[in-house]
Amino acid sequence: MDCRIKSGNDERACHLRPYAPADEDAAIALWLVTWQATYPQFDFAGRLDWWRAHWRRLAQAAKIVVATGAGEAMIGFVTIEPHTHYLDQLVVAPDHWGKAVAAALMTEAKRLCADFIDLDVKTDNARALGFYKKHGFTVTGDGINEFSGRPIFHMRWRAGA
């Protein structure tokens, strides 16, 4: 599936495709750079062993869609578990923030789970909160992330709402 990357008056093609096991290292590297840009005060490099194990569990249970740009470099991905409708990760390279890559990945997630999608987002992640609200998600509750201990919002998108 093709998508468009927008930057001012410039538009470039991107491509959405299913994840392949050969993508693992690129996905893990992209996760690291993206989360470090979002929360520079935290040591995400120190969490790489945890993340690799988590990623491998996701790869078994979830549908993963990868966004690629020029030269087929990975610029984003979304993971969604079709049985639970849980969106675990929506990651876009910082230099592609605001350029419609996340929107294309969200559209694909909604296609894969057309009834509803649940997710958790850190309460202080204003960029993500704004994005999810723009795409029809509403806050359904709050809690604490069991890994980080940080406060989160539970959010849901429901088709037709």
Report each predicted region and the residues it spans.
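Conserved active-site alpha-helix within GNAT-family acetyltransferase domains
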Residues: A103-A104, D124-G141, F147-P151
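Acetyl-CoA-dependent GNAT
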Residues: P18-D95, M106-E108, L112
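Intrinsically disordered, low-complexity, positively biased terminal segments
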Residues: M1-S7, P94, T107, L112-A114, ...
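Conserved N-terminal entry element of GNAT/NAT acetyltransferase domains
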Residues: M1-A22, W157, A161
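Active-site acidic-Proline motif in GNAT/NAT acetyltransferases
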Residues: A93-D95, K99, T123-D124
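Short hydrophobic/aromatic beta-strand or adjacent loop that forms the aromatic wall/cage
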Residues: A62, G149-M155
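Conserved GNAT acetyl-CoA-binding A-motif
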Residues: L112-D124
